[in-house]
Structures are given as structure tokens and as C-alpha cells.
């Protein structure tokens, strides 16, 4: 695409928009250490200066478009995990800073975070970007900083409410079976590795949440949409 074209044109005109009529949530641009941009920023032209001003970069030129079902905290954790693995380890800010940020993010998606973790993430991000020796380290925190800025409420939901608004983070999901939709086919029970689902054929099944390991196998197995997570 030509330099200067807007993100909106690339995503909706050239790319065809979001699949299955889902609502646009964010786009991550520039590779694993690029920032995440929201709807109000889609009219920004794709050039070096414009993207830098809004906390992103062209980088590798790749775009990752996310819809309403995407958890932005998990997105930040995913990209930080990649960056941490790729760190050469030469400089302390990148080697130790990214490791510490990843530990915090993993704690948050597991439902064990605290509000003070958000301040620590911001402090670490500032330290790493200002003191790391190479481009990878200097841009490593962009996914975290950009998602914290635009989706702070999602971080707070994981920490305060112990819920993932997008129902993505496994540790924060609870699976249930809607008795009105369940046909009693037993596919969910047969696919459950923890034997947490019981019931009689042609009658509604139920999930024992004390045994459930939250793997989501039942959600995938049900052909009637009777299994749901909250």
C-alpha cells in the first residue's frame, strides 16, 4: 500500500473489515513491539512521523486487527512474552525489565494482580524505553503502554472484579450449561478431561465448577451453543 494511506482504508476498504460483523476494537501495528491503536486513531496516515506521534510505529509493516472478543491484557502479555524471549540479555533494563513486566502481566491475567501493579508497569515501561541499549528494548513496552492508556478499565476488571470482560483469560472464566439450550447429547461430558460434566442422555447436563479445569473443551464440543463462559 502507498505510504500515507490511513489505517481505516487498509483495514476496512482493502482488508474488508472485521469478520462476521464483529465490532472493531484495536489494531496493533509495527510487529511485536508496536503499539495498539483504537477506533479514534484509524484516520491517522501510515507514515513514520504520524504513527510515532500516537505511540506506534511502522516497524515490520504488519497489522494485527482485533475485535470485541479480544482481551487487551492478554494481548499485552502475549507480545511481552515474545519480546522477553527475544531479548539478547546484554543490557539489564531489557533483560530484567521485560521479565518483571511479563511476571506482572501473567499475575494479572491469572486474577492475582493488584492496582499497584499498573503503576509498576508504567514505571518499568518508562525505565526500559529510556535506558535500554537497542531498538527492541526501547520499544518493548509499547504494547503494554498503549493498552494501559486505552483499555485501563480492562486491566482494572481483571484485578478488582476478577473477571475478563472478553472471556478470554482462562483462570477468570467460569463455564456453565444453559438447560434451555442443552439437548442432552453428552458431547461436552465425553470431551471433558476432568470428568466435571454429568447428566443423563436427552436431559440437561451440568458442570461441577469445583472439578472444572477451565480448559474450554466443553465450549468447543457443544453443537447447540448451550455452554457459555462468564
Roles of regions detected by a PLM:
Residues 1-174:
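Redox cofactor-anchoring modules in respiratory/redox and cofactor-processing assemblies
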Residues 4, 88-94, 134, 164, ...:
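Short cysteine clusters
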Residues 29, 170-171, 180, 185-190, ...:
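Non-ligating segments of multi-cofactor redox enzymes
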Residues 84-87, 127-130, 178, 184, ...:
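Short metal-coordination and nucleic-acid-contact micro-motifs, chiefly zinc-binding Cys/His arrays
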Residues 93-99, 177, 187-206, 217-230:
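Iron-sulfur cluster-binding cysteine motifs and their immediate structural context
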Amino acid at each position: 500500500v502507498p505510504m500515507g494511506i490511513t489505517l481505516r482504508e487498509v483495514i476496512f476498504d482493502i482488508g474488508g473489515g472485521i469478520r462476521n460483523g464483529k465490532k472493531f476494537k484495536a489494531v496493533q501495528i509495527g510487529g511485536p513491539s508496536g503499539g495498539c491503536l483504537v477506533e479514534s486513531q484509524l484516520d491517522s496516515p501510515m507514515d513514520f512521523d504520524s504513527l510515532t506521534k500516537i505511540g506506534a510505529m511502522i516497524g515490520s509493516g504488519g497489522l494485527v486487527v482485533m475485535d470485541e472478543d479480544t482481551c487487551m491484557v492478554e494481548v499485552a502479555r502475549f507480545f511481552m512474552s515474545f519480546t522477553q524471549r527475544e531479548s539478547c540479555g546484554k543490557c539489564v533494563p531489557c533483560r530484567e525489565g521485560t521479565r518483571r513486566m511479563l511476571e506482572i502481566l501473567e499475575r494479572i491475567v491469572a486474577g492475582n494482580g493488584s492496582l499497584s501493579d499498573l503503576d509498576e508497569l508504567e514505571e518499568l515501561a518508562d525505565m526500559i524505553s529510556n535506558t535500554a541499549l537497542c531498538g527492541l528494548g526501547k520499544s518493548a513496552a509499547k504494547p503494554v503502554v498503549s493498552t494501559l492508556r486505552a483499555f485501563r478499565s480492562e486491566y482494572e476488571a481483571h484485578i478488582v472484579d476478577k473477571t475478563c470482560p472478553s472471556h478470554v483469560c482462562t483462570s477468570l472464566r467460569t463455564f456453565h450449561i444453559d438447560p434451555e439450550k442443552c439437548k442432552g447429547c453428552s458431547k461436552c461430558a465425553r470431551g471433558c478431561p476432568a470428568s466435571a460434566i454429568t447428566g443423563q442422555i436427552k436431559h440437561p447436563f451440568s458442570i461441577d465448577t469445583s472439578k472444572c479445569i477451565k480448559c474450554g473443551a466443553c465450549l468447543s464440543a457443544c453443537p447447540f451453543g448451550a455452554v457459555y463462559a462468564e
